[in-house]
Design a protein with these regions (language model features):
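A nucleotide-sugar donor-handling region in carbohydrate enzymes
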Residues: 139-234, 260-263
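Short N-terminal targeting/anchoring amphipathic segment
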Residues: 96-118
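Donor-nucleotide binding loops and adjacent catalytic segments primarily
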Residues: 30, 202-297, 349
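A donor-sugar binding/catalytic signature common to diverse glycosyltransferases
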Residues: 287-331
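A short, glycine/small-residue-rich beta-strand->loop->alpha-helix junction that serves as a flexible
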Residues: 14-27, 51, 232-233
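C-terminal amphipathic helix plus adjacent low-complexity
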Residues: 3, 354-407
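Conserved nucleotide-sugar phosphate-binding/catalytic loop shared by glycosyltransferases and other
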Residues: 7-9, 14, 32-87, 91-93
Length: 407
C-alpha cells in the first residue's frame, strides 16, 4: 500500500488583468489546500492592486508583482509604473522566477494563461520542470468563443507547452456544461491530462469573515453585483432604470459597484440611488458571501466566481452577460439557462426598463439551482485537494482516475 505524500508548499500564479476573477478563484483554491492539509503553505503570485483588501487564511500569503491593466481592446499596459509593458513584464517575470527559486514549491498551479502574461512564467515552468515539481494548468469552465481561443493559443504557441511542461490540466467545471478546449486541436496525450473537477464551492456565510457592510434592509432584497465592476456600468444602468420605471418594486435592491468601476460612473449612479427609496449601494465588499446568503435573488453578469457563489448559496439568479471582449459570460449563462440553473436576460443594446423590471419581479420565484440535479456540480475543491495529494506521490495511478476521468 502506497502512502500518499502531501505537498508541503504550493505556489499559485494568478493571471491578473481585468476584474477580480482570477484572484478570487486562486484564493478559494489556496484556502481549500491549507484547510485540508495542516502542513501546507501557499503563496499566490498576483499583480492585483487590491489583493491586500482580502483576508487570507493562516499559511496563505501573497507576493505582489507590478500590476498591469488589460484594456478593452485586449492590449495591456502598466497599472501605475511609468514603464512600458515590456519592462513591466520583465520585472514581473524576474519576481516570479525568484520567488519560485526560494520558495521551492512541491506544486505549481498556473491560472488560465499557460505561459503567463506575455510568456512571463515560461522560464519558471522550465526551471521547476527540471526540479521535478508537478506543474498544473488550471482553467475555468469557459475560456472564450472556441474559434477565437484556438487562434489565440496558436499565436502564443501554447500546445507545445501543454505537451512538454504540464503534468495536468484541471478544468474547474463539468463537461456537460462546457469543454473549454473543444475546438483546440490537442494531441491525445494532452487531452489525457485534462480533469474536470466540478465548480469551486465558496465559503458559507458562517465560515466567511464578517462583511464590512450591514444589510441595509429588514426584508428580502436583490443583490446586484457586476464582479469587479470595470465593465458593469451597462448592467447597473439597466437595473437602476428599472427601479426608476417601477414605482412600487416588490423587492429592494443592494448594488455593489465593484472596485474597478470608474469613480465618475460610481458618483453618477450613487446620485441616482439617493433619489430611490428602495435602492442602496456600496462600492466594494471583499467578503460578499454574507450579503449573497441573505439575498432573495442575485442579478449579475455571470463571471466564473459569481456563478460559483450562485451555486453555493443556491440563489435564484438573473444573468446579464457581457459579450465584449470575450463571449465567456454569454456561453456560460446560455448553457446554465438551458440546464435550468439560472435565467439569462441578453443585453440587446436597447435595454428597455420595463423588460428589466419584469425580470426583477419574477426573479425570486424562479427555480433555485438545486432544483436541477447535476452530479458533481460543486465537487471542485475536494477534487482539487485529492488531485494535489496524488501529485505529491508521483508515479502512482493516473490522476484522471481520481476526479471522474479525463476529457
Amino acid at each position: 500500500m502506497t502512502t500518499e505524500k502531501q505537498p508541503q508548499r504550493a505556489l499559485i500564479y494568478s493571471h491578473d488583468s481585468f476584474g477580480l476573477g482570477h484572484l478570487r478563484r486562486c484564493r478559494a483554491i489556496a484556502h481549500a489546500l491549507v484547510d485540508q492539509n495542516p502542513s501546507m503553505s501557499v503563496i499566490i503570485l498576483s499583480g492585483s492592486p487590491i489583493i491586500g483588501n482580502f483576508d487570507f487564511r493562516r499559511r496563505v500569503d501573497f507576493v505582489r508583482v507590478p500590476g498591469v491593466i488589460k484594456l478593452r481592446n485586449g492590449d495591456y499596459t502598466s497599472h501605475s509604473l511609468d514603464l512600458d509593458i515590456e519592462q513591466t513584464v520583465a520585472m514581473r517575470a524576474s519576481i516570479v522566477r525568484h520567488t519560485a527559486e526560494i520558495f521551492d514549491p512541491d506544486l505549481f498551479i498556473v491560472d488560465k494563461e499557460p505561459l503567463g502574461l506575455r510568456g512571463e512564467v515560461a522560464e519558471t515552468l522550465e526551471m521547476l520542470r527540471q526540479r521535478g515539481t508537478p506543474l498544473v494548468l488550471g482553467l475555468r469552465d469557459v475560456m472564450d468563443e472556441p474559434s477565437l481561443l484556438a487562434t489565440e493559443w496558436e499565436r502564443k504557441n501554447v500546445v507545445p507547452a501543454l505537451e512538454k511542461l504540464y503534468d495536468e490540466i484541471w478544468v474547474y467545471g463539468l463537461p456537460q456544461i462546457c469543454d473549454p478546449l473543444a475546438e483546440i486541436n490537442l494531441p491525445p496525450e494532452v487531452r489525457r491530462k485534462m480533469v474536470y473537477t466540478g465548480y469551486l464551492e465558496r465559503e458559507g456565510a458562517r465560515g466567511a469573515p464578517a462583511t464590512e457592510h450591514a444589510v441595509p434592509f429588514d426584508r428580502p432584497y436583490l443583490l446586484v453585483t457586476p464582479g469587479g465592476g470595470g465593465d458593469g456600468e451597462a448592467m447597473m444602468d439597466w437595473v437602476l432604470r428599472a427601479y426608476e420605471y417601477d414605482a412600487r418594486p416588490p423587492y429592494p435592491a443592494l448594488l455593489v459597484f465593484g472596485p474597478f468601476m470608474q469613480n465618475e460612473i460610481q458618483a453618477e449612479f450613487a446620485a441616482r440611488v439617493s433619489r430611490l427609496r428602495d435602492v442602496e449601494a456600496i462600492t466594494f465588499e471583499a467578503n460578499i458571501e454574507p450579503l449573497i446568503q441573505e439575498a432573495a435573488g442575485i442579478v449579475a453578469m455571470g463571471g466564473y466566481n459569481t456563478f460559483c457563489e450562485i451555486l453555493t448559496f443556491d440563489k435564484p439568479s438573473l444573468i446579464i452577460p457581457r459579450t465584449v471582449p470575450r463571449m465567456e459570460q454569454f456561453i456560460r449563462a446560455n448553457r446554465a439557462q438551458e440546464l435550468g440553473l439560472v435565467r439569462m436576460l441578453a443585453d440587446d443594446g436597447v435595454r428597455l426598463a420595463r423588460d428589466m423590471a419584469t425580470a426583477l419581479r419574477h426573479l425570486p420565484q424562479q427555480n433555485r439551482p438545486s432544483d436541477v440535479v447535476v452530479p458533481g456540480l460543486l465537487d471542485g475543491l475536494p477534487n482539487v485537494n485529492r488531485l494535489a495529494r496524488r501529485l505529491g506521490n508521483r508515479g502512482s495511478q493516473p490522476i484522471a482516475a481520481i476526479a471522474g476521468g479525463s476529457a
